[in-house]
Amino acid sequence: MLNIAVDLLWLRPKKVGGTEFYIRNLLDGFLQLEEPFRLWLLVSKDNKETFRHYTQDKRIELLETEVVSANIAGRILWNFFCQNRFLRKKGIRKCFIPVYCRPLFNGGIAYVNVIHDLQAAHYPEYHPFHEIAYSRLCWWLDAHFSRHLVAISDWVRNDVKEKYHVKSGKITTIYNPITVDKEELVSFEQLAEKYHVAENEFYYTVAQLIPHKNLHTLIAVMERIKNTDVGLPCRLLISGVNGESRDKLESQIRNRGLEREVTLTGFVENAERNALYKYCRAFLFSSVFEGFGMPPIEAMLFGTTVIATDRACVPEVTQGKANYVKDPYDVEEWIRVMQNPADRIAEMDFAQYDQMKLTRKYFELLRKYLE
């Protein structure tokens, strides 16, 4: 029987973007499995209550630590030097870590890690030196000491194989499970009152406010629409957890006189996000680097036109069925694509992101390498 720890100490609720949705979707999938298993969720003082409800299933228990996830440096040190001993004392010898971070040594514990991307390797200019050093160390440890690796797209798998010389048999691609409840919606009247938008007369995007999401280009697109007669709605809503670019984006919005046209909504709950997906003219995905990219697929599940960059994994995970901008920084190209988007959503195979299909892939992989 599968009997493993699941390291969740890295998760700072509503602070880590898509990785939080990924692991919660996966854990929700485990609840629906009929097979026997035992998951010990390794949780921190400041995230444990967000996982408490999983213990209603007798197959899942919390392993509470003294770690504070918000104290990133403290969490890393505990992860490096204390985690193995903690697990051994609990009689646990196998651990699944759904991100790249891990202890310095195995210490008698078998680990399976998930690598979501190698962002700091591709865009070091967006990260301080200590983040780059830590990321590269963990990726090297994953490649050399973890029993097996999961990549969240073929693009990431190939990237890891190339940069860390990982053999094909040691890394498996499993897409992120995507769950969208199409009935979980606030009314459009609520959106209209809150954001002063008209149905099908605004654009929407979901992205963490960090540089490689390329949101400054979308703001420039809105400025061009406002100042020229291109026949497009001049209204953009941007949802996502705060990041280092928030101040710069707010300044850009003010300096261009777009306070009425561009709104940073901050984090929004699923019901509001879903309604924004459904009622927008199109979903714009300007990111230049992604390991997977869940928001475009979520938008397409609502039948919404998606306009995205063709960088990294985005064409792969959208199955080539979105509308693509070849130069993600070219304002004029964005406008041209926005003026004449194609609708190929009916050709999408959404079963590739099915929660239970992918949960079962994880279950079988973890049984193979950790049972």
Each predicted region: which residue ranges?
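Carbohydrate transferase catalytic cores enriched for Leloir-type hexosyltransferases
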Residues: 1-371
